[in-house]
């Protein structure tokens, strides 16, 4: 220990001498040997130090070994030590030197607090530090001599300071093409099939896929991958299906076929193919999943890559391929059937026709519209995002069947891709929907031109019974805005998504072994550098799961896999199940079929209300989660085949519920299910934004009391007008669908309210909304009248 003390003693004396006689300029040279790296390189942005979490450093308790410093000098006077430490902290030269060594004001303060606490609470300190502190207290040294010890302590609690250059190199995302050496080793031919929905662009790419000796199809949805899987095998081209949850072999002996249809996240960048097809390439800009399209485009090892999607992505794909030295051939396609935007809105559900599809952007609207259609004696199919793929296909089959009495479809934008539907007319119930901005915050905004065209293009599909498609809106005011949206050019795709790889996170963890996975990701994104062609995808879902399972002891690779699980974090039951999966996994206890059945209470009965239907959908997601994990940890999730069997049975149960959805809605709204109102409010009207801090229950209470008055800050006159229109329409629908709910019925039964009074209340409610008062004007009138009365009394 004594031999180790002298180098720092000599260095500290040089530091003190430099500060006292040469200032900060000479001090930089003196301290150079104590700093292995600096936090900021030339021209690099400063890291976000608020993400740097200090590593706890416990004070030395008890004399584990003899106190050499006290033997060489004398015991320290802690009072004098504290005074001199505070002097050290206030020295401007020390603060400036800390900045040059990567300690900004925040880190400097945190490091000093930890340094002072360590010295004051330790029963003994290292011999070299003890000698320096003793010299300072005796007047033989200067407080500046503490800087090397302070910097050493700072690097112990902030280990990233000592490896900032390495961390910057690891998180440098400016050359993604270099991540795929196998693809760079061959000269690939890129063919871009550009065109609108229903133009045949994907058909031509698939024909080349089928004629190739080997090929891979990469799609955004399991439904699309399954469709290509079936088409390929039907054409006598053996094709395997690979999704996150399963692998289906074309041959009975489970031998890998030369063709593969997969979801895009599952494509291999190491296997060589003759032809690759990347579908819906415009999703390369998606804030959450865009990285998967970037990875496929840059990394697929195929002689020919056929890219299908909107023409808005042509320029970006061309620029990306320029960086790889590959040229892009563009083939443009036009729509095969005409699509007409009608000059009149639907205005009433009484005007529905066979082949109509009403598009809603919330579950609440789905439920409301479905019940109103049923009240008119019509049957309707229902499709929304959280339904299992099998149920979606069954509902689509029911709607497409010319012999089925179901001629109306009520759906969300989930119909935009993945389903073949015989739709004559698309009717937008609204033109606003929830969106996620660049910061990961949810906002309410008008649908984009790309979204509107994707949905509208489902009408009049080529080969269906309707030779042309029609598009309109539910409300007259929305139709004007819809026409404007559809007439605008789709803005070009400007950047491609990127996501840190497991290898990059592992290298980060090597340098920062005490950091949490969530903190590692934050620091990675903070230090990452991307050029103008790329952006880092939103990682909020990943961080949410990382924080949720942080307390469970898992190795980094397993923890990373659990955090990439595809689940909806808004579903508490699914999140809780993932937590239980991770906990049992950490104990090295296999998650068996029996365990899963006990957890999900299988077997399950058909739903009696909406709340039970939503729970069944969550259970289906849990089965998906089990299958997804079984694909990655086969030994720990051994019963995938059994789970897949009961998942098919659950599909049938959910299908029964969806077929009777109007009965479930009635049961929920009549109060048959406790808590059903909360489920119904899941898709609350879109006038609620992230700026409205009220809870769902507050929203429900407000609906029963008075109309909502929520100020929306949406840029643009068109958006503001469309939001006002939608809010008005939503309230009218709420009046029709909820106004005669349990409270109204009770008042009618008790004789406190008549039908005429109820109609008058509805009329007054709508009039109040149109005037924009919502009780505010009456309140002001009451205040002014009370003042006048007060004056008269005086």
From Swiss-Prot:
Enzyme Commission number: 3.6.4.13
Keyword tags: ATP-binding, Helicase, Hydrolase, Mitochondrion, Mitochondrion nucleoid, Nucleotide-binding, Nucleus, Transit peptide
Asked whether the UniProt record includes Endoplasmic reticulum among its keywords, one would answer: no
Q: Which GO terms describe its biological process?
A: DNA recombination; mitochondrial mRNA catabolic process; mitochondrial mRNA surveillance; mitochondrial ncRNA surveillance; mitochondrial RNA 3'-end processing; mitochondrial RNA surveillance; mitochondrion organization; negative regulation of apoptotic process
Instruction: Tell me the ranges covered by the Helicase C-terminal domain, including all copies.
Output: 341-506
The keyword ATP-binding appears for this protein: yes
Record protein name field: ATP-dependent RNA helicase SUPV3L1, mitochondrial
Gene Ontology MF: a single term = DNA helicase activity
Q: Where is the transit peptide?
A: 1-30
**Residue intervals of the Helicase ATP-binding domain:** 182-322
The record's section on Gene3D superfamilies has: 1.10.1740.140, 1.20.272.40, 1.20.58.1080, P-loop containing nucleotide triphosphate hydrolases
Identify the species of origin: Gallus gallus
State the similarity comment: Belongs to the helicase family.
* SMART domains for the chain: HELICc
Tell me the compartments it is located in: Nucleus; Mitochondrion matrix; Mitochondrion matrix, Mitochondrion nucleoid
Region annotation (Disordered) ranges: 678-741, 764-794
Give the required cofactors.
Mg(2+); Mn(2+)
Compositional bias of kind Basic and acidic residues:
689-704
Protein residues bound to ATP: 195-202
- Reaction(s) the record says it catalyses: ATP + H2O = ADP + phosphate + H(+)
Gene label: SUPV3L1
| Role played | Major helicase player in mitochondrial RNA metabolism. Component of the mitochondrial degradosome (mtEXO) complex, that degrades 3' overhang double-stranded RNA with a 3'-to-5' directionality in an ATP-dependent manner. ATPase and ATP-dependent multisubstrate helicase, able to unwind double-stranded (ds) DNA and RNA, and RNA/DNA heteroduplexes in the 5'-to-3' direction. Plays a role in the RNA surveillance system in mitochondria; regulates the stability of mature mRNAs, the removal of aberrantly formed mRNAs and the rapid degradation of non coding processing intermediates.
- Cellular compartments per GO CC: mitochondrial degradosome; mitochondrial matrix; mitochondrial nucleoid; mitochondrion; nucleus
